[in-house]
Amino acid sequence: MTEYKKVIAQNKKALFNYFIEERLEAGIVLKGSEVRSLRQGKASIEESHAADTRHEVFLYNCHIAEYEKANRFNHATRRPRKLLLHTKEIKKIIGRIRIKGYTLVALSMYFNKKNKVKVELGIAKGKKLHDKRESIKEKDWKRDQSRLIRQK
């Protein structure tokens, strides 16, 4: 059974720059003008990451554009946003992040079937330069294989 997801933003760089070891879903605390802006698709999570602060997890560097029809009570575009997770999940994430080399990266932001905004997070380990080159070669080889198969 496939789940309904209306994708707002994706972080394609994260898949290239990190080895994603585990994926999880989290809710996010937003203001009304932020939700309206997200419905228009005006968000970017290219440079965003999550970190723990006093047993809570926050999403940093996520850009949600200002809603142009909002009045003077508009939101700040790059403010830290609290992620909604269960206590067990938070403890598990904090335990994994504290290990050297691991980070929590936002992979995608979407509306679920109940029209709630969700963020897909990945517990990731950074790639070295030679790993990135290897993944580029692998990608090119798969592309060449599909071309060869189509030509036959």
From Swiss-Prot:
Family matches, as InterPro entries: SmpB, SsrA-bd_prot
Coiled coil start-end: none
GO terms for MF: RNA binding
GO cellular component, one term: cytosol
Keyword annotations: Cytoplasm, RNA-binding
Classification via Gene3D superfamilies: 2.40.280.10
Main location: cytoplasm
UniProt cross-references to HAMAP family, sorted A to Z: SmpB (MF_00023)
NCBIfam families: PRK05422.1, smpB
PANTHER family: SSRA-BINDING PROTEIN, TMRNA-BINDING COMPONENT OF TRANS-TRANSLATION TAGGING COMPLEX
Protein name according to UniProt: SsrA-binding protein
Species assigned in the record: Rickettsia conorii (strain ATCC VR-613 / Malish 7)
Highest classification ranks of the organism: Bacteria, Pseudomonadati, Pseudomonadota, Alphaproteobacteria, Rickettsiales
